[in-house]
Regions:
Chain A
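Generic macromolecular interface patches on structured domains
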Residues: 41-42, 67, 98
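Sequence-pattern detector for short linear motifs
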Residues: 31-33, 57, 65-68, 76, ...
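Short leucine-rich amphipathic alpha-helices used at interfaces
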Residues: 4-13, 28, 65-66, 74
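Amphipathic alpha-helical dimerization/coiled-coil segments
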Residues: 1-15, 33-38, 84-122
Length: 122, 122
DNA sequence: GTCGTACTTCGATATTCGTCGAACATCGAA
DNA sequence: TTCGATGTTCGACGAATATCGAAGTACGAC
């Protein structure tokens, strides 16, 4: 289907385990990190370049959306996603921040523009 | 088997996804919260009172241990577990703290002493 | 209207995970 | 040494999950 307007949960109704489960998957964590590392606050669905099928990507984005982690916006037949980091900070203070700050093996080698070199290098 | 000395991972080798996955399960999150809410820093294995089989509990404790979240110590035939919160703070600054601080539906109604009333009430 | 693009949903599959009871291993006590 | 207590491991099971390709749906362009 075309990107029909998706339901976005009220963050007050999102449970911590849901958020943790959403983040506890390498591909999804990578997506979150990529969105956080961008200069623009939005990323075009089409430009999310990962070695997975598009249907799988759609699946992961849905899980992140249901966990309150990202916002998707429709523009014609296209879709743009962005982190709900401000809201998440209100609901789970410090969580997203420390997840993003942490250094581990899940990197952000996602081409097609938007990756900040300065962050990637630190 | 009796509580043979278990392997505890070096926290530098523990990945964020491993920790998140360990925490992203209601029973395990409950165990972590219970350990954090205790006055004594240790809890006897035997006194962890949850509505699950003992083999299941053993399984969950192993996952938490492998994620670097808890430490288990053997004393004769008994076992005592405690949070590795200080070390986790060094590896993933702020993570455990904000997970414990967050308010959601996973409570800590675990009897047999050790639950702090002041925390439970806040 | 017809076609193509852009996502989403469906159905199928393989893997992982939570759970249990039973069997096992280790220690202390009798 | 025999017994009981204490955890752990094993084997099995159903449920959940990550993945894909194919089919479907909505929109813009022509």
């Amino acid at each position: 289907m075309a990107p029909r307007e998706h339901p976005h949960p009220d963050l007050h109704e999102v449970e911590l385990v849901t958020v943790l489960a959403a983040l506890a998957e390498p591909t999804r964590l990578r997506i979150v990190r990529m969105l956080a590392a961008m200069e623009e606050r939005e990323r075009a669905w089409k430009d999310i370049d990962l070695p997975i099928a598009r249907s799988t990507l759609s699946h992961h984005l849905k899980i992140l959306r249901n966990a309150g982690l990202l916002w998707s916006r429709t523009e014609g037949t296209r879709c743009f996603v962005s982190l709900r980091d401000k809201e998440m900070e209100g609901r789970f203070p410090g969580l997203l921040e420390c997840v993003l700050a942490c250094q581990d093996s899940v990197d952000v080698p996602m081409a097609k523009g938007g990756v900040r070199e300065d962050r990637a290098a630190s």
